[in-house]
Amino acid sequence: MAAAGAAATHLEVARGKRAALFFAAVAIVLGLPLWWKTTETYRASLPYSQISGLNALQLRLMVPVTVVFTRESVPLDDQEKLPFTVVHEREIPLKYKMKIKCRFQKAYRRALDHEEEALSSGSVQEAEAMLDEPQEQAEGSLTVYVISEHSSLLPQDMMSYIGPKRTAVVRGIMHREAFNIIGRRIVQVAQAMSLTEDVLAAALADHLPEDKWSAEKRRPLKSSLGYEITFSLLNPDPKSHDVYWDIEGAVRRYVQPFLNALGAAGNFSVDSQILYYAMLGVNPRFDSASSSYYLDMHSLPHVINPVESRLGSSAASLYPVLNFLLYVPELAHSPLYIQDKDGAPVATNAFHSPRWGGIMVYNVDSKTYNASVLPVRVEVDMVRVMEVFLAQLRLLFGIAQPQLPPKCLLSGPTSEGLMTWELDRLLWARSVENLATATTTLTSLAQLLGKISNIVIKDDVASEVYKAVAAVQKSAEELASGHLASAFVASQEAVTSSELAFFDPSLLHLLYFPDDQKFAIYIPLFLPMAVPILLSLVKIFLETRKSWRKPEKTD
């Protein structure tokens, strides 16, 4: 009986050892990998090497220029050399990590018969009308016509002319260095119509270090897929003024044609409102000499905040909002004028704030009060108002007057208020700005994800990053090829994808879940199971070690 009991006990101990080893094997072989897999932070692969390469990206902005020579514009020996191509390239000196080079590819050729006929007409406007082709030129391209040195197409004191479309006229010269002299003139005209240091500096104002001209360069709106424009009539004294403004007709006649011409740069929505009892929030000063009130330049920044609280247009907007306010001063503070820094009245009686909008003060004619009972009827002259607002709108979009070369004649404004080459110049600037923004966003995202290892990177986030990198590369290639329209579209895609990836909410899911919290959660689960297994393994190890050391019995 004793032998049978000892055998049973030995069998039970062996069974316990095998069970402990089995549980330990299951925990190590299956449990640990399963726990590791189910608790790991999923991080999809990202193109880190390509993103780091974007910091050394060099932009080559190619402007295709077709140069058409008429008869007697250059010496006959030079005309026999046509056609040929000349490339002029220079680096734009900006304090920015991205190197930008501007490349003017000038394709020289002789004028065709219909071009000769058009350029021999009496005025440059007639020539432009005859040269209009059914098929428009590509965005970003230019055509320069070189006319005879003694041609009457331009005033005799003018050496060049910039038209409303993508065309210009330059006087030729009978000189042995004609091509070199004319080539320099063409580059000056082409730069005024496309890319200059100031245009690109304004586009990269948020990415460049502060300097003496940064404040002015930061005036234009940042690039966006859409913009909202709000026209507001502020009538602080409705008891004295019954103001009527035909804002719908004014927008239809003046603003909408301009926005239609600007449509390639983004989507636009326009609305209007009338605000009663809306005060400027600044007490104007009285000038006894002129019996009028005035706002000096130093008080203008304090005007916007009190008024902005009444507008309510930017609170729920996804896009940048431009506010244009027409303020009819109350009777007690009429007439009201805006003074410049020298104390002189501003001719337009208006001012604008960078990336916000503009305000115009509209004074009621004093004669209106003499023969009328309050409130007086006020008919707003919308032509005068829209001239001011459209000028401010151009400035806020970065469409400023170009720096013309010497003796250059600029075409008058078009009915849309925007020349075709001005739109191209805006698209150049917006493309560069978008690439800089996308590159900065991707670089910041890569640095953030590299430093914090417990941020989840989902596949859709990685997909947006890959899209953004590909779009940046495509846009840079299209810019180098002179395809402005497709380059601008690709740059917009780059910004959109990079910001979708950077601001994806899933990146924050485990950001505030440190390792000590993980231990606090998992130890109560694993400790009750792990302790018996570990103790059994230790006991088995000690018994096995003891049996190895036990000496063999000898007779």
Curated annotation (Swiss-Prot):
Described purpose of this protein according to its UniProt entry: Component of the glycosylphosphatidylinositol-anchor (GPI-anchor) transamidase (GPI-T) complex that catalyzes the formation of the linkage between a proprotein and a GPI-anchor and participates in GPI anchored protein biosynthesis.
Residues modified by glycosylation: 267, 370
Residues the entry annotates as binding a cardiolipin: 15, 18
Functional pathway: Glycolipid biosynthesis; glycosylphosphatidylinositol-anchor biosynthesis
Consequence of substituting residue 301 to A: No effect on function in GPI-anchor attachment to protein
Pfam families given in the database record: PIG-S
Cytoplasmic topology ranges: 2-18, 533-555
Entry's family note: Belongs to the PIGS family.
UniProt topology in membrane: Multi-pass membrane protein
Effect of residue 335 to A: No effect on function in GPI-anchor attachment to protein
UniProtKB keywords: Disease variant, Endoplasmic reticulum, Epilepsy, Glycoprotein, GPI-anchor biosynthesis, Membrane, Transmembrane, Transmembrane helix
Source organism of the structure: Homo sapiens (Human)
Transmembrane segments: 19-39, 518-532
Protein name, entry field: GPI-anchor transamidase component PIGS
Gene: PIGS
